[in-house]
């Protein structure tokens, strides 16, 4: 809670807080919650974001519900492309320090208002998302519902091709 409070204090001062999620470790648990409290998120395809990590979900719900060893499943549900398509990440970049730097620079000075109205809009968007995709059993079905061209090939696409495939979704 201390980190969330500090993020909110910085945002309230009008300073944009930009989170960068790359590499192979993922952004899970409390720090995943803190990441969503920031103004902007930049993620790579390899970056992952979730309230619970794959192993935690598997331990709580069983391997039948979520197999943490199924890397394709993990990336489809928590990976950068999915988070970008769902609107959780503002930008997706190659997993490269220079790409992250350039993207972060592009967002400097772009703070988002931290108001009750903004929080209520986010809650409504999440409720709408749950209703819209409640019948989807896999991320590829969500991508199809979003209208992503050739959704089954999203995991194989390089970032430029992926951005082309998904341009109309965002």
Residue ranges and their predicted role:
Residues 105-170:
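Intrinsically disordered, low-complexity segments enriched in small/flexible residues
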Residues 1-116:
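Conserved catalytic cores of soluble enzyme domains
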């Amino acid at each position: 809670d201390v980190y969330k409070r500090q993020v909110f204090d910085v945002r309230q001062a009008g300073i944009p807080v930009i989170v960068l999620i790359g590499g192979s470790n993922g952004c899970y648990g409390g720090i995943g919650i803190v990441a969503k409290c920031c103004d902007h998120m930049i993620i790579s395809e390899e970056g992952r974001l979730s309230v619970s990590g794959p192993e935690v979900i598997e331990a709580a719900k069983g391997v039948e519900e979520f197999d943490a060893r199924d890397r394709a499943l993990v990336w489809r549900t928590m990976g950068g492309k999915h988070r970008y398509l769902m609107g959780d990440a503002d930008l997706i970049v190659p997993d490269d320090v220079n790409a992250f730097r350039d993207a972060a620079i592009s967002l400097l000075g772009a703070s988002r208002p931290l108001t009750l109205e903004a929080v209520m809009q986010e809650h409504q968007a999440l409720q709408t998302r749950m209703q819209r995709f409640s019948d989807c059993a896999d991320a590829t079905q969500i991508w199809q519902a979003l209208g992503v061209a050739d959704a089954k090939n999203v995991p194989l696409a390089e970032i430029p091709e992926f951005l082309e495939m998904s341009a109309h979704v965002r």
